[in-house]
Amino acid sequence: MSPLAHLLALPVRAYRLIFSPWVGYNCRYQPTCSAYALEALQKHGGLIGAWLTLRRILRCHPWGKCGYDPVPERTRKP
């Protein structure tokens, strides 16, 4: 993971550690949005991983879809 991806993963890990047990596991998608964010940052790095995470969070609302929504694979070689 790039240094930017590590930095962007800190708030996600803090959310999972502090807030997620209190608010419950209510994500409409599988994997959960926080797991998706960490996987996207790991696979795609800071910029693209953050973009994918933002798009996913914007899709996760009561009137949106639900179900299996994996992180897309990288299309280019690193």
Curated annotation (Swiss-Prot):
PANTHER family: MEMBRANE PROTEIN INSERTION EFFICIENCY FACTOR-RELATED. It comes from Roseobacter denitrificans (strain ATCC 33942 / OCh 114) (Erythrobacter sp. (strain OCh 114)). Keywords: Cell inner membrane, Cell membrane, Membrane. Coiled coil: none annotated. It is a peripheral membrane protein. It comes from the Bacteria. This is Putative membrane protein insertion efficiency factor. SMART domains: Haemolytic. GO terms for cellular component: plasma membrane. It holds the Pfam family YidD. It is found in: Cell inner membrane. Belongs to the UPF0161 family. Could be involved in insertion of integral membrane proteins into the membrane. Its main location: membrane. NCBIfam families: membrane protein insertion efficiency factor YidD.
